[in-house]
Amino acid sequence: MYSCKWGLTLKQCAVVFLFLKPLPSFLKFSIMKKILFAVLSLMFISAQAQTVDEVIQKYSTAMGGLDAFNKVKTLKMAGNVSVQGMDLPLTVEIINGRAMRNDVSVMGQSITNSFKDGKGWKINPLAGVSSATDVTGTELNDFRIQSMMANPLMDYKARGHQVELLGQEDVEGVKTYKIKLTSKDDGKVTTYFISTADNMLIKSVSTREMQGQEFEVETFFSDVKDFNGLKFAMTRTQKTEGQVFQEIKYTSIELNVPIDEKIFDK
């Protein structure tokens, strides 16, 4: 019999005795398996808690780095939007974090979205909006996000967003990390798919309101090119219900070029 030592209570001594008492081999093996499983589970949980930030950091680095994007003052992009069999000229002008304007030319008319210092407006003759009309709510927030060059994932903490790693998923044969981002501003959820091989963004999924209805929109990013150390996807293909409804192809990108701020005013 084991006697109580080290000032332990009888109950504590009983627990010690259980560990000291020889156990049958099969029981030892069973206990060891449970301990090993518990340790591995804790290790996995710990790794998961760190992985989402590690994936985002690797993605940010692959794109050129958050600091580098934040140092860019202005951005000009030009290209074409392919929609319903038409190729429409597109221009985008951004003052990083402050202002954004994009123009699409359609049959001699212009569809314009603009944002500056918290206010936004739009013109869309094809939708009956022939003069500059203020935008509010989710649409205004979308314009504001477009004025920021860095992807919301890169500095999600500073913006107050929530992120969650949802595991891995194949996207058209590419193994990716799947990350859910919930916006602090409007609760909108965007899911990002980042390649496990080169840490580049392959696809994003979000909801968009079109003609009074909400649709899930998939955006695929391809033809990535380097401009002064920063990566840009020159082709962005958008699908809903598995069908392509729009494709944007940029033909030129200019960084830190003069932009007249008056173009953002109504």
Predicted ranges, named:
Residues 175-265:
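Gly/Pro-enriched, hydrophobic low-complexity segments
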Residues 90-95, 112-117, 131-140, 194, ...:
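Short amphipathic beta-strand/extended segments with alternating polar/hydrophobic composition
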Residues 50-61, 122-188, 209-215, 259-266:
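Flexible, processing/modification-adjacent segments and terminal tails
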Residues 86-88, 100, 106-110, 172, ...:
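Subset-of-secretome marker
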Residues 118, 125, 171, 196-197, ...:
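Short, ordered coil/turn segments that flank beta-strands lining enzyme active or ligand-binding pockets
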Residues 1-52:
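Bacterial Sec-dependent N-terminal signal peptides
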Residues 54-128, 164-165:
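N-terminal mature ectodomain segment of secretory-pathway/periplasmic proteins
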